[in-house]
Amino acid sequence: MTESTQLQTAENNNAGVVKMEPPPPATSSVSVSAAAAAHALSSLSSLTMAATGSALSPATPPPSLNLSHQQQQHQQHYALKWNDFQSSILSSFRHLRDEEDFVDVTLACDERSFTAHKVVLSACSPYFRRLLKANPCEHPIVILRDVRCDDVENLLSFMYNGEVNVSHEQLPDFLKTAHLLQIRGLADVNGGYPYSKALSAALSHNSSNNNNNNSSSNNSLSNNNNNNNNNAESSNHNKISSYLSPNQTSAACNNSSNSNSNNHSSSHNNSSSNNISGSLNSSLNSPFSAPQIPPPVTASSAAAAAAAAASLTAAVAAAAAATAASAGSSSSAASGQTSGTPAIQELKASSAASPVRNPNPNPSKASSSNHWDMGEMEGSRKSHLTPPPQKRIKSADLFRAQHGISPERLLLDREFPVAGQHPLTRNRSGRDTSKDRERNLELRESLLGQALENSNGQQANPKHELGQSAGEDSNSSDTEPSDRGDGQHDGTLDGIDNQRSHSFPNAFLGLQGIPGLLPGPSGINSDFVSRRSLEMRVRATDPRPCPKCGKIYRSAHTLRTHLEDKHTVCPGYRCVLCGTVAKSRNSLHSHMSRQHRGISTKDLPVLPMPSAFDPELASRLLAKAGVKISPAELRARASPTGGSGSSGGGGGGGSSQAKLDLSNASGGPMDDAEDSDDDPEDLTTGNGLYGMGGSSSDLSRYHESLLSNFGHARMRNEAAAVAATAAALGQPKDLGVQLPNSNAPGQSLLDTYLQFITENTFGMGMSQEQAAAAALRAKMAQLNAMGHSLDNLPPGLLPGQFDLSKLAAGNPAFGQSGPGLTIEPIMRHEQAAGNLSPNRPLALNSGGRMMGHDEMAENDGDMRREGSEPMDLGLDNNQSGSNHEVANSDAEENYSEDEGVHNT
C-alpha cells in the first residue's frame, strides 16, 4: 500500500481494538494487501508495546506475556472505511450507463428508447421492482405509453445522479410521471416498507420535543404568536409528515435533532420552521411531494401556513360531506368514514398549479373545530400503503370504504398501470385484457368514483349519452373518439371537473363490458351494445358478392381466390414437374395437390409464363421425392404447345387439342361454362340450378357442364351426385328413391372406377362426353345393383350427346379398334347378397344394353387377348394403393381442371 495510513489505537480494558482509517482528504480507492496487513500488524504490536510502557525487551519476553500478546492480536479487529464509497459507486453506475455496459432493460416511449440497469430501476422504484420481478426476462422492454421521452430521460438522470434540472413548464408533467412510476425521492412510496413506522415514530418524537422546547424561539420570531400557534405548527408538522418525500422527511428529522443537540438555538429553529412551512406550501400547491427551496420565514408566513392547513382541513371535510350526501349516506357516517382519508387532489400537466379555493370563509373556526391528530394520520397511512392511481379521487375512496374494498388487496394483487395513461384509455386496455382482474378492479373504482363525483353536478342528458354511445362503441369501430381531452381545460380544477363531466357518459360506456361491475343490467347502454354487437356478428357472416360477376362467396378469402382466378389478367404459371400451365397461382396449387400427391411442393420453384418446360429439372425434383423418371421420358410425355403444329405433336396432340377446343352444348366457350358452374364456393349455384330466373339454355348448359364434372372430378357427396344426375335427365330433384350413402355396397369400388375414368380418359381414346356418359351409366348401374329400377329409361330422356351407341358409331377408335366399353362396378358377394342375384345384369356394353356375367367374362377375355397394357403411373409403386390416388403421367400432362388448368 503506497499511500500513508493513519492508525488510531484505542485500547479497551480487556482487549485493544485498533481502528484504521484513511486520512481526512478523500482518496479515490483503498486496497489492503496481505503484505500491508502484515506490516500493519507488526507496527501495531510495536505501538501497543510502547503505549503500555512495557520495559521488557522484545528479544526476551516471558512465555506467559508472549502468549497473552498473541491472544490479544487474535482478538483485535480492524475497521476499514472507504469515505467516498457512495460517490464512487454512484459514479460507477453513471459510467456504466454512459458506456451502455451491462445494461439489461430498455424503456421505450414516444419513438425513443433508453437503456438502463434493472438493479438501479428496482432500487429507485417499487413499481419497476415489481414489474421486473413479475417478468424475469433477460432483457425486457418496458413500453410506457403516453409518456414523454423528456420526462423519462430526466427520471433516469435523477435515478442515476440523484438530482436533475427541470424547467418550470415541464415540472408538472415530470412530477406526475414520477408519481405514477413511484420514483423514490419524487413520490411518497415509503408507506409499504418496514422503516416507515420507525420514521413516523422519529418524526412524532422530534415534533413533541420541538413543542416543549421551542416556546422562546417562537416568541422571538413573533410576539403575536402564542402557545396555540405553537401547537398548531406542531400539529401541522405531524399532518404533513406523511406527505413529505424521503429527502424532505430526513431533512426535517435532521434539523430537529440538530436543534435539540445545539441548545435549541434560534437559527436552527428558524430552519426547522422553514422546512415545515415550505413543505406545507408544497403539499398545498402541488399534488406531489418534491424537494423545493424553502422561502424565507417571517411571522406572516408562519401564520399563513397555519391558516392554509386549517382551510385545507375544512375543504376536505366539506367535500367529503357533500359527496356522502349525494351518494345517499348520512353526513355523520361520511365524516366517520373519511376522517382518516386524506384528500387526493390531482392536476393535469400544466404550466402552473392552480390555487385551492377555500369554501369556508372563516378558516379560524374550521381550524379550531377540525384537527388531525397523530392517531388519525397513522390510520390513514396504514390504509394507503400504495400510492393512488391516476384518477383516484375522494369519491372513489368513499366508494371503496362503503363497498368494503380493501386497499391491502390492491397492494397484494395489483397489476401495474401504464404510466401516464388516461383512465378511459386504460378502460379499453382493460377490456382487451379482461383476464387481469385487478386492473379491472382498479378501473371499476376509478370509473364509479367519477360517476359518484359527477352525481352532485348537472345531470347528463340521456339523448346526449345515447349520441355519444353511438360513437364510442369500441367493439365495432376502429377509430374511436378521443377522450383524453384536448388540453383546453389544463391547469385548473374547474377544467378537470368540466372534462370529467363531459367524459362521464363515455366513462359509463365502459362499465358494461366489465364483468361484475354492476349487480344487473345498467340500462344505460346494454340494449344498444347488444344490438350493435349482433349486427356486427351478422355482418361478419354475410356472403360477399363479387363486384365483377355478382357471384356470392362465403368469405373474403374465397372471394379473393375467385377474383384472382376469374377476373385477373395473368400470363399463367407452368408446373415444374409435368409442364401443365395453370392460369393462376391458386389453380397451380390445386393442380399440384391433386396431380402430384405425395410430393412436397412447398420448395418447388414457381415458373411464370412464358417459361419452357425443363425435363432435366423435373427429373431431379422427382428424384428428390423418390420418383425416378428419366428426362427423356418426361420430354416424350410432355404435352404439345397447342394446336399450331409444334414439335412433339402426334396422337397426343390431337387429344390435347380436342380437349382445349371442347365446347358445351350451347356453343359457348369453355371459360363461360367454368365461370357459371365450376366454383364450389359460389353460393348462387343453387339459385341458378333450381331458381325461376334462369333461361332454359342456361339451365341446360349448367346441367351438361355439371355432368362433365363426372369426367374430371370425383364428387364425394353422393346425394349431390344423384341430384345432379336427376337434373341432367330432366327428372325432379326428389327421385323417390333412397339415395346411396357412403357405406353402400361397392361404393369404394365405384369411386375408384370413377377416378380411373377421370385420370385415364384420353389414354383409353375417349372424349370427355364419353367419359361423362360412362360415369353416369356406372352410377345408374350401382343404383340398379342396390335394387332401384332406373335401368329402363324412357326413350329420348337421355340427351343425345350422352348416348353411348351414337358415341361409339361416331368414334371409330372407340367403336371398332378399341375394346368394348365395359363398366363393371364389381361388388363382393357378401356385400350384395341381399340385393344381387347371380343372373342380374350389372354392366353396360358399348351398345348401351345391360350385360350378364357371361358376356362380361367374354369381354374381359377379349380385352386380355388384345393385349391392352395397364397405364404406367410413373411412381415406381411408391404411391399406388387401393384408392388409386395418383394418376399416370399422361393424365398429368393432359389434365384440365375446373379452375383453369390447361396445356400449351
UniProtKB/Swiss-Prot annotation:
A zinc finger (C2H2-type) spans 544-567, 573-596. The modification Phosphoserine is found at S474, S837, S846, S868, S889, S896. It is found in: Nucleus. It comes from the Eukaryota. Residues 671-682 have a biased composition (Acidic residues). Residues 429-438, 481-500, 851-868 have a biased composition (Basic and acidic residues). SMART domains: BTB, ZnF_C2H2. GO terms for biological process: axon choice point recognition; border follicle cell migration; dendrite morphogenesis; muscle attachment; mushroom body development; negative regulation of transcription by RNA polymerase II; regulation of DNA-templated transcription; regulation of transcription by RNA polymerase II. The keyword Nucleotide-binding does not apply. Residues 204-238, 254-286 have a biased composition (Low complexity). Residues 103-168 form the BTB domain. This is Protein abrupt. It comes from Drosophila melanogaster. The lineage of its organism: Eukaryota, Metazoa, Ecdysozoa, Arthropoda, Hexapoda. The gene is ab.
